[in-house]
Amino acid sequence: MVRLINKKNIKYVSWGIYKLLKLQEMMTYLRNVDYPDVKQCIYVMWHSNQFVVHGFRDKNKTSILISNSLDGDIVSYVAQKWGFKVKRGSSGRKGAISATKQLHDELMVGENIAIMVDGPRGPYHEVKKGAIILSIETGVPIVPVNWYSEDKSFKEINSWDKMKFPLGRCRIMNIYGKPIYPENKTEEELTAEVKNTLLELEKISPQKYKQAEKEGLWKNR
């Protein structure tokens, strides 16, 4: 079977998807809740919530790790159009080492980074070590992020990561956890704290969403 996306048409496909996302952006009302008051951080999210990055206020000083694949080429194109810096890496050992070094260098010059901690292929909701090691090595805090909506236009697709995204007019909330600092914590302790915080954000999101509705968070569209 011929793959619909290939090296010959990847530029056109990327451009087309970006234009579709721009159209969706006009119908999406994304609001930030509990945005972190930190100068620098490592944003982390589940792979299913990768579009949370669109709500970040500091896109131009944030690097995103994206896989070296054709699908990654599309994501990379869109991310750069949105104003992010992009670092590419693979799930193999050499690719992971190269990607970690690139992100480490960005942190050392005061930039932020964003990592999907159970990507690129899972296991589902299992935090991998990349963000954890970078936080311990640099001292930069980790900020977990979740996104949530109760609108019917907020869809979940049948994929390994249960990806969520808006399709039509949609009110969405980005909810941020408190910064997690690595001092005096082992890899295992920090990993557990990050995972538990991400799961807790998912748990409290419905309550936060209802509270935001009462406070009129989406009145000024």
Please give the residue ranges for each predicted region:
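Catalytic-site beta-strand/loop segments enriched in glycine and acidic/polar residues
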Residues: 104-138
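Amphipathic coiled-coil/heptad-repeat helices and related helical stalk/stem segments
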Residues: 46, 96-100, 127-128
